[in-house]
């Protein structure tokens, strides 16, 4: 049985989470794995960097004077902190649209202080609080720039959603005819493809010019640099993606997805990592990711010390007392083709 991530209450094993891991180089060669690296996965928000590439490819980011922090924000699953909300509002202002044009829905933001402030002021939740509002503002920027229909931008038949599908097909080397499409939590199309191909996408995001010399590579490079330069826009305070990119200081690009997905690209080795927690529980993702990085020899103890809360995540009770821990217990398998290369 795959009991890769273990949850302890005191010293007693209470729960386990199975995981799947694919580690791929920029050529698409599987280097390491655990579980089923070909498991079909909805990567969810992990695809946001590639959705951002589709925006850049239209010329919209340049036309509307996107700074790096804007590019990073359209890759975000943000916490709804004030600087995130202000960033989305700034983008909407540049394209002369209103918050009501965002079709992402809304929810209580991860940043509870922002929510408490909203309640104290007698306000109500609006789309800008959605963790996907940055992505949607990016999509709308491309749609406005291309003079396309704004109301239908979420539909898979919309030209911009087809551009996104093409980017994913190209970067992940998986035919779009075989990509299953469903609807993400924020209402836009979400794409299902093998974990191995998702990892390939992140290898190419990390080192695009080792893959090919093209406009797509240039756009991947631009998006990756923006995320690493402004990791606070991608997640926020006390978020794994943000903290990982900040601590590794422009070596790693990282993006989580709902239902237990975590993806990472390493600029130095050119490796792409994709992780899926089988039961979809996100509490296992950072612990699994840090163990994968450790086994790959990416980083050192000084960096890991700064990320200790993600290596062995604490289990807290309602009083915020530490009453348990979440740990990793698995060994990556080195693939034969990697041994021979």
Protein language model regions, located:
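Beta-lactamase-like hydrolase cores
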Residues: 1-38
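Structured C-terminal helix/loop/strand segments within mature extracytoplasmic catalytic/sensor domains
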Residues: 205-341
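Bacterial peptidoglycan biogenesis and beta-lactam-recognition machinery
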Residues: 57-64, 96-99, 146-152, 158-165, ...
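Short Gly/Pro-enriched turn/cap motifs at secondary-structure boundaries
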Residues: 10-13, 129, 251-255
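A short glycine/serine-rich beta->alpha loop
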Residues: 34-42, 74-78, 122-130, 182-189, ...
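Short glycine-rich loop/turn motifs
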Residues: 16-21, 137, 165, 259-262
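Active-site SXXK
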Residues: 43-61
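Active-site-adjacent helix/loop patches that line small-molecule binding or acyl-intermediate pockets
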Residues: 1, 67-174, 178
């Amino acid at each position: 049985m795959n009991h890769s991530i273990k949850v302890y209450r005191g010293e007693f094993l209470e729960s386990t989470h199975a995981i799947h891991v694919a580690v791929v180089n920029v050529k698409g060669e599987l280097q390491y794995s655990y579980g089923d690296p070909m498991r079909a996965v909805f990567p969810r928000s992990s695809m946001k960097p590639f959705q951002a590439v589709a925006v850049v490819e239209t010329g919209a980011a340049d036309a509307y004077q996107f700074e790096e922090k804007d590019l990073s924000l359209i890759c975000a699953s943000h916490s709804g902190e004030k600087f995130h909300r202000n960033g989305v509002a700034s983008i909407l202002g540049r394209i002369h649209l209103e918050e009501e044009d965002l079709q992402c829905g809304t929810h209580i933001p991860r940043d509870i202080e922002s929510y408490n402030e909203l309640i104290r002021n007698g306000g109500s939740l609006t789309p800008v609080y959605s963790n996907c509002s940055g992505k949607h503002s990016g999509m709308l920027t491309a749609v406005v720039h291309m003079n396309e229909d704004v109301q239908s931008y979420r539909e898979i038949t919309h030209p911009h959603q087809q551009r996104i599908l093409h980017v994913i097909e190209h970067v992940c080397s998986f035919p779009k005819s075989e990509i299953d499409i469903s609807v993400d939590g924020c209402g836009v199309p979400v794409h299902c493809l093998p974990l191995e191909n998702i990892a390939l996408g992140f290898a190419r995001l990390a080192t695009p010019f080792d893959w090919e010399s093209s406009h797509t590579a240039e756009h991947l490079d631009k998006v990756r640099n923006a995320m690493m330069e402004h990791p606070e826009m991608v997640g926020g305070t006390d978020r794994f993606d943000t903290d990982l990119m900040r601590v590794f200081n422009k070596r790693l690009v990282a993006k989580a997805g709902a239902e237990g997905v975590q993806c990472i690209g390493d600029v130095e080795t050119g490796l792409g990592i994709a992780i899926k927690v089988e039961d979809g529980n996100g509490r296992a993702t950072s612990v699994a990711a840090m163990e994968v990085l450790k086994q790959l020899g990416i980083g050192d103890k000084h960096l890991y010390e700064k990320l200790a809360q993600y290596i062995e995540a604490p289990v807290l009770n309602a009083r915020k007392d530490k009453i348990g821990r979440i740990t990793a217990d698995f060994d990556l398998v080195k693939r034969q083709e990697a041994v021979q290369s």
